[in-house]
Amino acid sequence: IMAEEKRKRILSGIQPTGTPTLGNYIGAVRNWALLQSDYDCLYMVADLHSLTVRQVPADLRRRTRELAALLLAVGIDPKEHVLFVQSHVPAHTELAWVLACNTQFGELSRMTQFKDKSAKHPDNVNGGLFTYPVLMAADILIYNADLVPVGQDQTQHLEIARDIAGRFNGIYGDTFTLPEGYVPAAGAKIMSLAEPTKKMSKSDTNINSFILMTDDKDAIVRKFKRAVTDSDGVVRFDRETKPGVSNLMCIYSTFTGKSNDEIAAEFEGKGYGDFKLAVAEVTADALAPVQAEYARILADRAYVDEVLKNGAERASRLANRTVSKVYRKVGLLQLDK
């Protein structure tokens, strides 16, 4: 009998920069839980990446623990898979240096996210922001991940990770797996409720533009009521001419499993008020059990820390093996342990 085919490995990370939004939930975290049955998963709280923006130390610590608790609450299984904090696995930064020495200045200069962010915050264009894609490449390559769930804004970073891996393999012999992007089938991108042509973001100054995973039902209803739609009063999917309504349909579809045609039929002849309330109801109902579980897990600080300690140990075993191999290949002297 043939051995069971080796499961592919997935690595994904999320920064602990505030509570995840409904967009993060639908686009990423919810899928993380669903991927567990088919893949070996490593899920990372990317705290080192957060340092490209100056953080309040106590807040960063608290949010790191909160994010870990939230990931456990959505159903990440820390026994079957690996949940860890990036800074707890020092090998990431060790590999990042070697990779940086195999990355061209020009390649990093061309990264659109670097150009966008440095234009937006010209007062803080730090070296970390510039070499961010190298650390991200290290995060992925250190585990020889086969697949990386990425949003549109990160595809370029995945490309450079593949380029760096391919170049390193070419010079030093086969070392790294070339990772591929994994784009989930449904609802990958949830837009702002206030400006439905741009992505929902927790850094938005208008608090009505996003829904946080921890928002209570009243807040959810209030924010959906204020969501921007259009004046034609028909629930119909069309991203170009009806971005607001289409975004709400996307959210409704995610939680009900209904197709756009079914949703259009359900609300035929009804106003947007009814539709918005229905979207708010299904969203609040979907988030309620996650919120209850989150509160329960967060209250058990020792458990969260135990999970993270265990995750760091398991991640480090894989990561250290890669770094050791890379150090040997590039000629760094290693002494017998």
Give the predicted meaning of each segment.
Residues 56-57, 147-151, 235:
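Short, polar/flexible loop-turn hinges at active-site or ligand-entry regions and domain interfaces
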Residues 116-168, 172, 192:
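Internal, conserved structured core segments that host functional sites
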Residues 14-16, 47-49, 146-147, 204, ...:
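Short, histidine-centered active-site or binding-site loop motifs used for metal coordination
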Residues 103-109, 142-149, 253-263:
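Short helix-capping/linker segments at secondary-structure and domain boundaries
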Residues 3-11, 16-138, 282-285, 295:
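N-terminal Rossmann-like or analogous alpha/beta NTP/dinucleotide-binding catalytic cores
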Residues 22-24, 162-337:
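Conserved nucleotide- and phosphate/pyrophosphate-binding catalytic cores
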